[in-house]
Amino acid sequence: MPGVSSNPSDLFELQLSRLGEEHFLVLLWAAMGEDRQVKYNITNLFDDLKHGGITRTKQTAVAIVESLRILCLIDVRDERNRKNIYITGFGAKALEKLITTGRFVKKNSAFLEELKQ
């Protein structure tokens, strides 16, 4: 394809440019959960996205998670009947880049905030 670079960093930048707020929030909340040593799962994510007015269906939350998993930005593990979300090294790099660009505004996870109290 003309005009397409084979440079891996160009691919990473292109992938980041296509991520939306919902992807950013999954990366953010997964990282926050890991920092607090709390398992953050798809059900928590769905509740947080619903609370934030981003989605009304669990199917959308699962699709968001699956897209990030395919890009190797998160891992999803079945643990005790839950699908827990873990940020990868690539995901941490993506999150850092998204935060520094200021494209998205940080929003609190209701689940993680509840645990803080």
Where are these regions (language model features)?
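Non-catalytic, well-ordered alpha-helical scaffold segments
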Residues: E21-F24, V62, T88-G89
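Short, amphipathic alpha-helical interaction segments positioned at domain boundaries
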Residues: F90-K116
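Short acidic, hydrophobic short linear motifs in intrinsically disordered regions
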Residues: R36-L49
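Short amphipathic alpha-helical interaction segments
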Residues: I54-L71
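Minor-groove-contacting beta-hairpin "wing" of winged helix-turn-helix DNA-binding domains
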Residues: N81-T88
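Short intrinsically disordered terminal tails
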Residues: M1-P2, K116-Q117
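Short alpha-helical segments that sit at the start of domains
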Residues: P2-Q37
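A short, conserved structural fragment
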Residues: R69-E79
